[in-house]
A protein has these predicted regions:
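ATP-dependent helicase/translocase motor core
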Residues: 1-198, 202, 206-214
Length: 214
């Protein structure tokens, strides 16, 4: 098989947490090892314990940047209590809505095929043109909103209104882009297109610019 993801899994009962998993990637894993090389082997790296999950798409030593990959709890961070198991069991078992977990085959193939993409940003430094590349992997809330809205539109057709809330810096542009692409190619059970076109309207210049580059 192909190595598409790595996981550092920690257990609080042995005195380690997700923070130890993050540090292990930073200090104990050689970023030049083939499996950890950016764009070469694994596409995403998860730091996980029984309660929380974080992920990154680029291991870069102390410059490694982690993003939360949690369900959210009581309109805040983290994961809710799971009476049937670990708080992070949504990764390998079932989601709260009963759908298959994030790491199950069909779910992960959907992420790779319909979410994951390489973002290339052109910039200039000291008069020299450069490129910054980033692998964009959806955070949990982005993945869920795209999947749920798409499924509802497939089942109920066009004409419904939705209120989707994102906090500042949580990836609104990517969520909008992913959902727009899915809806534009969405068909019903008779293979008829549900939407003739998808139009994105925004009242913020910054968001408008971000969307054009997404």
């Amino acid at each position: 098989g192909l190595p598409i993801a790595t996981v550092e899994l920690k257990n609080q009962f042995s005195g380690q947490s997700v923070e130890n998993a993050k540090k292990q990637y930073v200090y104990d894993r050689e970023p030049n090892e083939p499996i950890f090389l950016f764009k070469k082997r694994a596409l995403v790296h998860f730091a996980v314990d029984a309660d929380e999950c974080y992920m990154t798409t680029k291991l870069d030593g102390k410059r490694t940047r982690y993003l939360p990959f949690n369900l959210g709890s009581n309109n805040g961070a983290g994961n809710p209590l799971n009476k049937l198991g670990y708080r992070t069991s949504y990764l390998w078992d079932k989601l709260p809505d009963g759908n298959d977990g994030v790491w199950t085959k069909d779910s992960f193939m959907d992420i790779i095929g319909k979410f994951l993409h390489l973002s290339v940003e052109d910039f200039e430094l000291n008069g020299i043109k450069k490129k910054k590349e980033s692998i964009i992997f959806p955070r949990f809330h982005q993945m869920q909103v795209v999947r749920k809205a798409t499924e509802d539109a497939r089942n109920n057709g066009a004409g419904k209104n939705y209120l989707i809330q994102h906090s500042a810096g949580s990836g609104k542009s990517n969520s909008i882009a992913w959902l727009s692409y899915r809806l534009s190619s969405l068909h019903d059970d008779t293979n008829k297109r549900i939407f003739d076109s998808v139009i994105v309207i925004t009242d913020r210049k910054v968001l408008d610019s971000q969307l054009q580059n997404t």
